[in-house]
């Protein structure tokens, strides 16, 4: 066991040791170690997770006859229920795409999609800042891959030109809203690029955009009117939609390939029907949350200006606002200071972010008030 203890001690010496906190949730507040704090670290972007009215309306429609609390099996065996198909049809209809497929989580989706859709003769070109789940999916794909500089589409174009005719297919992989910097990919440029090269497909993860952007809350692809141009559009229900699970919208052929070849889908017990029913309930109402989206954007613009004034660094265009401090010790100290002031802020350190860019990842939600965010800015 000594080798494992040494690993932990080394993490501690580098200020990279992590632990699971004991938390009590009270709406937009969190209590930790008897300290009640405004939660500045949540992905509950629309503030729906603690909405009692929504929860009550959902439960009332069933009376006491709730959907099952377990699927007990993979969907490909006995674990499929009508509500799964209902949700897939609703998602496909809203996106005006041929098909949609559900997954147990965003990590689950990103882990399994690329290995299912590539061969040893394929190529993956991924943005340098894509999420860890996408990196793990790339590693499992066992095909050639390269990472283009973050949002550098000239670099991506050079890689595409360099590899023309060398591979059976090429996947361009990106997030739309990047989870640590809060900046946004230029999906229009990516669509134009993929159209210039044969057998090239675009895979976009909208985990931090679904619910928050677009007229109907369908993400950056909807905002930019590009839904039909993206081969694989992936999103999660576990953030703005206050539920669990994930989806991909695509054509029917890709859906059938995933059903037949995606190991995390084939070999996992499906989500409980109860949770899928809650997701359906929320997703059905997604267009109704325009006031929440508008309020969130106002809060976000204010906080971005405040942080930029202090750090001179502001990559974000969204409700994810990075307060970049540099070293691990600085990020840990600032997080502790803000928690003492009543704000639940967490340090983000390597390897989650590049070395010397440790930060507080500030994440706003639509149930916060303008006064709360203004008071927080004073503490910065």
Swiss-Prot record:
Question: Which cofactors are reported in the record for this sequence?
Answer: pyridoxal 5'-phosphate
Give the residues the record marks as binding substrate.
Answer: 18, 131, 352
Keywords assigned by UniProt? Answer: Biotin biosynthesis, Pyridoxal phosphate, Transferase
> Which Gene Ontology molecular function entries are recorded, alphabetically?
8-amino-7-oxononanoate synthase activity; pyridoxal phosphate binding
N6-(pyridoxal phosphate)lysine modification sites are: 239
For this protein, the record's Pfam families field holds: Aminotran_1_2 (PF00155)
Presence of the UniProt keyword Zinc-finger in the record: no
What chemistry does it catalyse, as a reaction equation? 6-carboxyhexanoyl-[ACP] + L-alanine + H(+) = (8S)-8-amino-7-oxononanoate + holo-[ACP] + CO2
Highest taxon of source: Bacteria
UniProt: pyridoxal 5'-phosphate binding residues: 106-107, 179, 205-208, 236-239
Which residues does UniProt assign to the signal peptide?
Answer: none
Functional pathway: Cofactor biosynthesis; biotin biosynthesis
| Family that this chain belongs to | Belongs to the class-II pyridoxal-phosphate-dependent aminotransferase family. BioF subfamily.
Quaternary structure, from the entry? Homodimer.
Instruction: Quote the function comment for this protein.
Output: Catalyzes the decarboxylative condensation of pimeloyl-[acyl-carrier protein] and L-alanine to produce 8-amino-7-oxononanoate (AON), [acyl-carrier protein], and carbon dioxide.
Protein name (record): Putative 8-amino-7-oxononanoate synthase
């Amino acid at each position: 066991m000594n080798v494992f203890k040494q690993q932990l001690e080394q993490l501690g010496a580098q200020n990279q040791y992590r632990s699971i906190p004991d938390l009590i949730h009270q709406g937009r507040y969190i209590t930790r170690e008897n300290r009640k704090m405004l939660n500045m670290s949540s992905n509950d972007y629309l503030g729906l997770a603690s909405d009692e009215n929504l929860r009550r309306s959902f439960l009332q429609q069933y009376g006491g006859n709730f959907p099952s609390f377990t699927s007990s099996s993979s969907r490909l065996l006995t674990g499929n229920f009508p509500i799964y198909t209902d949700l897939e049809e609703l998602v496909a209809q809203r996106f005006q795409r041929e098909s949609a497929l559900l997954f147990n989580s965003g990590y689950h989706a990103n882990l399994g999609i690329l290995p299912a859709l590539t061969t040893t003769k394929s190529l993956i070109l991924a943005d340098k800042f894509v999420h860890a789940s996408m990196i793990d999916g790339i590693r499992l794909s066992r095909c050639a891959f390269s990472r283009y500089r973050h949002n550098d589409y000239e670099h991506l174009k050079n890689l595409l030109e360099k590899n023309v005719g060398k591979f059976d297919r090429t996947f361009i992989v990106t997030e739309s809203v990047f989870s640590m910097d809060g900046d946004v990919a230029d999906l229009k440029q990516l669509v134009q690029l993929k159209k210039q090269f044969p057998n090239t497909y675009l895979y976009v993860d909208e985990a931090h955009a679904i619910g928050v952007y677009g007229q109907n809350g369908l993400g950056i692809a909807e905002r930019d009117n590009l839904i039909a141009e993206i081969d694989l559009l992936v999103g999660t229900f576990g953030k703005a939609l206050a539920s669990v699970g994930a989806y991909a919208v695509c054509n029917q052929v890709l859906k059938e390939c995933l059903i037949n070849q995606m190991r995390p889908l084939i070999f996992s017990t499906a989500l409980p029907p109860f949770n899928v029913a809650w997701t359906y309930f929320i997703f059905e109402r997604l267009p109704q949350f325009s006031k929440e989206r508008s309020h969130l954007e106002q809060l976000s613009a204010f906080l971005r200006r405040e942080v930029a004034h202090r750090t001179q660094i502001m990559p974000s265009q969204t409700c994810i606002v990075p307060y970049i401090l540099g070293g691990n010790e600085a990020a840990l100290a600032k997080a502790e200071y803000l928690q003492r002031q009543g704000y639940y802020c967490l340090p983000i350190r390597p390897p989650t972010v590049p070395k010397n860019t440790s930060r507080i990842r500030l994440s706003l939600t639509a149930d916060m008030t303008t006064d709360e965010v203004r008071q927080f800015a004073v503490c910065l």
